[in-house]
Swiss-Prot record:
The gene is pdxS. The lineage of its organism: Bacteria, Bacillati, Bacillota, Bacilli, Bacillales. Belongs to the PdxS/SNZ family. One of its GO terms (molecular function) is pyridoxal 5'-phosphate synthase (glutamine hydrolysing) activity. D-ribose 5-phosphate binds at D25, G154, G215, G236, S237. Keywords: Lyase, Pyridoxal phosphate, Schiff base. Its EC number is 4.3.3.6. D-glyceraldehyde 3-phosphate binds at R166. This is Pyridoxal 5'-phosphate synthase subunit PdxS. InterPro entries: Aldolase_TIM (IPR013785), PdxS/SNZ (IPR001852), PdxS/SNZ_N (IPR033755), RibuloseP-bd_barrel (IPR011060). It comes from Listeria welshimeri serovar 6b (strain ATCC 35897 / DSM 20650 / CCUG 15529 / CIP 8149 / NCTC 11857 / SLCC 5334 / V8). The active site is at K82 (schiff-base intermediate with d-ribose 5-phosphate). It catalyses: aldehydo-D-ribose 5-phosphate + D-glyceraldehyde 3-phosphate + L-glutamine = pyridoxal 5'-phosphate + L-glutamate + phosphate + 3 H2O + H(+).
Length: 295
């Protein structure tokens, strides 16, 4: 019997439907409803948000399926869930449950420190993180339908997401400006599939959407990432670690949509209460940097 898989075109098309929107981390049905009411285009069902994963330490695994099911039953928007890098069984379980997307995520403790999942073998579309064009194209080559910056999850610090978005977009501009005979060397230097490097030169952009993630903590952070070329925004710990999650979630959505309306963003940012405290990058030990968990 032939194995059933989704085509790249279908998977990428599904991801394109989320373009311009906000995807929010939630840990229960109540939070999922708040996210949906605020205008989120999708939710990420988790057992713990990244800041709590970071604080707790230990091994972080796929969420309890009960939590994922509760979220799926509570909302009408797409539901995503995270699987550990390289953990075939976690991903297959989530696919069997009927989640709309799987995030092969460095936020969870990697199950395989050498190989990512061959995402083209699955029917469900995958989301993956990247810091540069090499990581981006390797994940697309494996079958990812959506990318996101890795940033530094659970810190409330936008600096790494900014770095990663600028890096990817700068390298895209380099590729677009290359002659055809330079592309093979570029593919080798980036550690990226040659055919995908050629596709970027032809399209002038990535063949999949690239969202901002990892450190988005305020409406201004979300708007900044859209200004820098993000196709949308993931918000992890920022919303439900704030003083007023419903108001904060709505402000993030509006700031993402109207990211050049600075007067509106200023109004949205008033009286939101305190955002999550955040962590300065220099205070993180190297072993605590989630973004370094995969290449």
């Amino acid at each position: 019997m032939e194995k059933k898989v989704g085509t790249d075109r279908v998977k990428r098309g599904m991801a394109q439907m989320q373009k311009g929107g906000v995807i929010m981390d939630v840990v229960n049905a109540e939070q999922a409803k708040i996210a949906e009411d605020a205008g989120a285009v999708a939710v990420m069902a988790l057992e713990r948000v990244p800041s709590d994963i970071r604080a707790a330490g230990g091994v972080a695994r796929m969420a309890d399926p009960r939590i994922v099911e509760e979220v799926m039953n509570a909302v009408s928007i797409p539901v995503m869930a995270k699987a550990r890098i390289g953990h075939i069984t976690e991903a297959r379980v989530l696919e069997a449950m009927g989640v709309d997307y799987i995030d092969e995520s460095e936020v969870l403790t990697p199950a395989d420190d050498e190989f990512h999942l061959l995402k083209s073998d699955f029917t469900v579309p995958f989301v993956c993180g990247c810091r540069d064009i090499g990581e981006a194209l390797r994940r697309i080559g494996e079958g990812a339908a959506m990318l996101r910056t890795k940033g530094e999850p659970g810190t409330g610090n936008i600096v790494e997401a900014v770095r990663h978005m600028r890096q990817v977009n700068g390298q895209i501009r380099q590729i677009v400006g290359m002659t055809d005979d330079e592309l093979m060397v570029a593919a080798k230097n980036f550690g990226a599939p040659y055919e995908l490097v050629k596709e970027i030169k032809s399209l002038g952009k990535l063949p999949v959407v690239n969202f901002a993630a990892g450190g988005v903590a305020t409406p201004s952070d979300a708007a900044l990432m859209m200004e820098l070329g993000a196709d949308g925004v993931f918000v992890g710990s920022g919303i439900f670690k704030s003083d007023n999650p419903a108001k904060f979630a709505s402000a993030i959505v509006q700031a993402t949509t109207y990211y050049t309306d600075y007067e509106l963003i200023g109004k949205l940012s008033k009286e939101l209460g305190s955002p999550m405290k955040g962590i300065e990058m220099s205070r993180l030990n190297p072993e605590d940097r989630m973004q370094d968990r995969s290449v």
